Amino acid sequence: ACIVLAGCQADRRSANEALSDYVRQNSKAVGFATVNPTEDPVTARQLKKEVLDKDLRGLVLYCAEERFHPAHSRAMNLYEAAAELNLPIFFHNCPPFSQQAVMDYARPFQLDEIARTFPTLKMIVGRMGFPFIEQTWCLLGKHENMFADLTIIPQKVWEVYNLVMSAYEAGVMDRLLFGS
């Protein structure tokens, strides 16, 4: 399977519709709808209609770019609904950042409260949480519901090798997602 993320754009509904059309034509694609919990509906009923009924299977959040704290009260309501529907959350908070992005909201340690509050909610830290990779290692070691992907753009070829070796040494190889 291949996870395909809806992009970070002002018209999230159109982005999700386009992604829905794409995954319906590509059986190996697993679509993650974009949502901003401070602006979009966040109940289980609304998520079912806007996500599951469109053959999308997860949610992607752009906290830094859309300038909301990952543990904002409306975001916590979203996570509760996502856990109820078994929808994983992909946190795509990595470079390149716009000048308006709030980098503090990109820090993986901000996800600790969410992981503790919703231990069954599957969460993926995009691009290993770059540039805050050490925080991602801590989360992966602490929470069994945390995963990370390796779609980083390394400055040096050996950086990805070092990440994989660090995951092996930390005993979290089973929580890495490989991608490009």
What would you call each of these model-derived segments?
Residues 1-4:
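Catalytic domains of carbohydrate-active enzymes, especially glycoside hydrolases
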Residues 6-7, 127:
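Residue-level signal for short, function-critical loop segments
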Residues 7-102:
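Active-site gating/metal-coordination segments in enzymes
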Residues 57-58, 71-178:
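Catalytic pocket-lining loop regions of alpha/beta-barrel enzymes
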